[in-house]
Amino acid sequence: MQDGLLKMPVSLGLKAYRALVRRNLPTQYVPSQDRPEGEVLWIHAPEKGNALALFDLAKRLCAQRHGLSVLITSNEALVSPCATIIIDAAPSEHPQDTKAFLEHWQPNVALWLWGELQPNLILAAHRKGVPLIMADAGQQGFENRRERWLPEVARDVMACFQNVLARTEPAHARLAKLMRSDVSLELCGPLMAGGQSLNYAQSDFDDLSTTLGGRPVWLAASVQSN
């Protein structure tokens, strides 16, 4: 629903939320570094403890698309594993900070993980024409006080996403009740680290491939004899 929020009236709850946010002082957002040349994919990962899977996803995306840089914003202190992955803090919800963040990074696509919505930041990205996708959406990511007492805020904000991928059946059921029916919602598995291929000598790989000759190989790992 790319333009849905722009064409539909905003709920009273969302208007009230945005008015309250404007009363706070901006934090004067300062980016962690200059924007790199080329395309930038922004991943926001508010859930803690999933850094390995997050970095694995970012590395795979960079490997598949030449010149791509991945910007990761998170609620925990992360250290970038390589030059193409950029770590930064997400801006506050004040309009001045969200504007500074988006004008600096100019993301080509945004991938929001888990939940814990930042309505002003998501709305600002949507209105700038940034394609938004939510993946690995978890039930706990939509269980804070605002979602319970002002479900219309989440309903308006979720309309900004083109696709929403839930990690579990309970999360899918929760989002189905929370979201508008015209937003794409699918059930997928959780985001997990898949592991990256280790460096190897091409000559060794060629020799092993020739020896195997296409025969199936059975690998038994971490097993013990009885």
Predicted regions and their residues:
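Positively charged, low-complexity intrinsically disordered leader regions
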Residues: 1-37
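Alpha-helical structural motif
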Residues: 5-12, 171, 201-204
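Residues that form generic nucleotide/phosphate-binding pockets
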Residues: 19, 156, 208-211
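A short helix/loop element that forms part of the nucleotide-sugar donor recognition site in Leloir-type
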Residues: 27-31, 197-213
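Active-site and donor-binding regions of nucleotide-sugar-utilizing enzymes
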Residues: 28-29, 39-195, 200, 224
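Glycine-rich phosphate-binding loop signature in dinucleotide/nucleotide-binding domains
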Residues: 36, 103-106, 211-214
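Conserved donor-binding/catalytic core segment of Leloir-type glycosyltransferases
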Residues: 41-45, 209-225
